[in-house]
Amino acid sequence: MLSSKEIRQKWITFFESKNHLKLESKSLIPVDDPSLLWINSGVATLKDYFSGKKTPPSPRIVNSQKSIRTNDIENVGITARHHTFFEMLGNFSIGDYFKKEALAFAKEFVLDVLKLEKEKLYFTYYHEDLETKQIWLDLGFDPSHLIAGSRKTNFWDVGMGPCGPNTEIFYDRGPKYDPRGVELLKEDIENDRYIEIWNIVFSTFNNDGKNNYSELKLKNIDTGAGFERIVSILQNAPTNYDTDLFLPIIRAIEKLTNKKYVVENYFQNEPVQREINTYFKIIADHMRSVANAIGDGAGVSNVGRDYIIRRLIRRAYRTGIQLGIKDEAFLYKLVPVIKDSLIFDYDTKHVAKVIKDEELLFSKTIDQGKKILEKEFEKSKKIDASIVFKMFDTYGYPVELTKEMAKEKGVEISLEEFEKYRQEHELKSKSKKGDGMKKVINFLANIDKKVDEFVGYDTLETTSKILYLFNSESKLNKLEGQGYFILDKTPFYATSGGQKHDQGYVEQDGKKFKILEVFKDKNWNHVHLVKGEIDSSKELKCVVDAKNRKNLERNHSATHLLFKVLRDQIGPFVVQLGSNNNEKRLTFDFPSQNKPSKEKIKEIEKQVRKIIELSIDRQYSNETIDKAKEMGAIITIEETEYMDPTNVRIVTFKNITSDLCGGTHIPNTKLIENFKIISVENKGTGIFRISAITTEKLVRAFNQEHFDNLIEQQQNIIKKIQKINPSFKYKNQFKSDDLEQRQVEVEESILALQQEFKKALKSQENVEINFENLEFENIANYKVYINLEADKNTIKAQGAQLREKFDDLLIILASVEKNSTILTIASKKYDSNKIFNLLKSEYSLKGGGNAILVQGFTSDKITKDKILKVLNG
């Protein structure tokens, strides 16, 4: 049986043998494409090649592109093939081969490479596209296996842009998956028998956005083959979740709960097990999305794509609760196995930390929610749906947990009413955001040429005329509130070429309004976002924030110097895959087989600083793109998108670097002042991201903060050692006054101290306890020993030793940290689990164990008096 990794490689190898250039999977986070929240298909990263905006590196391309779609999240785990994260296998022709070759390639791959049975293959085609039908017949396929589709099913059209008919390849898995036959395909009925494995789109026409179609001069092939579906067929798995892409993750989840995932239940369809299987699938699917998205640079917040990640983590977390998982944080433990099951590289420690932090935050949310609901349940036996929705919307408390808690308390809630509140909220949200932005984009589409001039290279202040003033509803004469404008000339740089937009303000009638954002439309006009009161008939005074611009220039110029040094230090193969320059820091993405060593990073940093100290003047010039190449200017595809090829702008730091660039730059390298690399992240297969800062002030502050953190880390280890060995002493004896050199010295001492701590722990495996000085309490039926100052590193061992020493003793130990307390309960005579549950009446505890020893966690403050009160009943 072929593994998923082997299947993916067979796809790439096959099309490489057909002269296709392999492109690595791009980041899930789109670059310079505001229309997408995520990369959601194989062709999404190639759109500019198909539109002619950019020249493709080859007319034939093959890839396996990781993608995310979250528009139908409720179906995940319920259907056999629905995922939020998936891979799309693609082969593309940009003005090269067309239908005949594309279908011949498809036949050869499915029959000769995948070895699928010819008689089990079915094909759909657009009913007017008889050419495609004839090609399938000429390739030797059964006419009864060719099914004519409608415009709805077999014509790819997404509004403005290239479109055309498509043909789909289906694989028949047999009647055990559905006794109904080919009518399932003919009537387009959702089923698990006929699995679509390949969709081939023939980009033949251009839609002008008003459903007027003209034939394209260059016809293209855009295909997408479902990787997970192909793997499930070749591994004879009932669903995609029963393949080696998901099962290792599911088996890892099983270790966190006493529930089991049963593959065979697909056919047995036992209701309780079906629900359990669904829970496993949801967690596995969502965490694949989360791990890979965070690995590509996504975060967790309440805004944009980061909110999607928060939603997926929280949905997976509450699903884990439904599986009976009691750990305060558990999802982060899946990160290594997720990485192993795929081919995408990232920093697992960073990804796991982001997930764990969100889990702990959500755990507190759940605890707070419980307390609020407890009060509501005490008031009434029926809870208003508005309260349920408020818990969900304001506090992020899952409605499923509210429902379970209500059931336990015998309280009624109306889920139908809750659903009404939720739908009303979604409609309001969509009308405010989605529809509004769509209208803005549609308005900009009506501006069919460049009408403005950017003068920000030469001046930071202008008096400008308003050419267009509008908001999310319509064109305006007067703006009151948030809206957009385009000027005849502007000093504000728009976000492009990796550089963030300028900050500043516009002034009219003595009133100043802050510039919130500046971006470019399709004709490179500068669109300004502002909130205020503006009259389109009056001129605007425009003022760029000079300090902010200077910081942007520092970081952008430092990016160019970094690029030069990377080529010198790592190799001429280094190219710029992406950059982001804002007023606070810069990032630079580049390919490399291995992560640069610490020593190499130090050398890169050193060489950039040397160039800064040379005090080299910046020079601008304008040339044709061909002349720029002759001059040896570095040209990135990212920059050519924003420039006229007959008049490109070149930024030069003499004898160091010449780059084609439309951004703004510092007049002399000495104004950058300093340069510090603050992190190097692995962003995917062979792609690394350097983050750096500039200026003496920021570098000094970073170094001081980093040094202070290292000292704190060092002192914490020393304290741990001293708890075990009170006579241990350590004092820093620095050899240098330089803060960065001192950091190195502290880092080296931390490594040595960690080894010392391991030795100390080993010598204390049998914890020494002075049994003679212990003080016991007799309360109710318990003889109890309580110690709320136990060492967290030995607390479990202490509990076990005391239990073995005293047969009739109840031992309660706690180790109090800043934000949480570790609790250990041990006893031979008393049931530790029962005591743990008693304490839950006073404390929000998580954890578990057995009758003789339980360990748990709480964020509540634990006191001896309260423990005794609980034991006394």
From Swiss-Prot:
Write out the GO cellular component annotations. Answer: cytosol
Q: What is its main location?
A: cytoplasm
The cellular location(s) given in this protein's UniProt record come to: Cytoplasm
- Record-annotated residues binding Zn(2+)? H556, H560, C661, H665
| Record-level GO BP terms | alanyl-tRNA aminoacylation
Coiled-coil segments, which residues?
Answer: none
Which cofactor is essential here?
Zn(2+)
MF terms from GO for this chain are: alanine-tRNA ligase activity; aminoacyl-tRNA deacylase activity; ATP binding; tRNA binding; zinc ion binding
In the UniProt record, does the keyword Metal-binding occur? yes
Any idea of its EC number? 6.1.1.7
Q: What keywords tag this UniProt record?
A: Aminoacyl-tRNA synthetase, ATP-binding, Cytoplasm, Ligase, Metal-binding, Nucleotide-binding, Protein biosynthesis, RNA-binding, tRNA-binding, Zinc
- Lineage: superkingdom: Bacteria
Report the cofactor remark. Binds 1 zinc ion per subunit.
Reaction(s) catalysed by this chain's protein: tRNA(Ala) + L-alanine + ATP = L-alanyl-tRNA(Ala) + AMP + diphosphate
Top-tier EC class: ligase
Q: What does this protein do?
A: Catalyzes the attachment of alanine to tRNA(Ala) in a two-step reaction: alanine is first activated by ATP to form Ala-AMP and then transferred to the acceptor end of tRNA(Ala). Also edits incorrectly charged Ser-tRNA(Ala) and Gly-tRNA(Ala) via its editing domain.
Record comment regarding domains: Consists of three domains; the N-terminal catalytic domain, the editing domain and the C-terminal C-Ala domain. The editing domain removes incorrectly charged amino acids, while the C-Ala domain, along with tRNA(Ala), serves as a bridge to cooperatively bring together the editing and aminoacylation centers thus stimulating deacylation of misacylated tRNAs.
Identify this protein by name.
Alanine--tRNA ligase
Q: Which organism is it from?
A: Mycoplasmopsis pulmonis (strain UAB CTIP) (Mycoplasma pulmonis)
Q: Which gene encodes it?
A: alaS
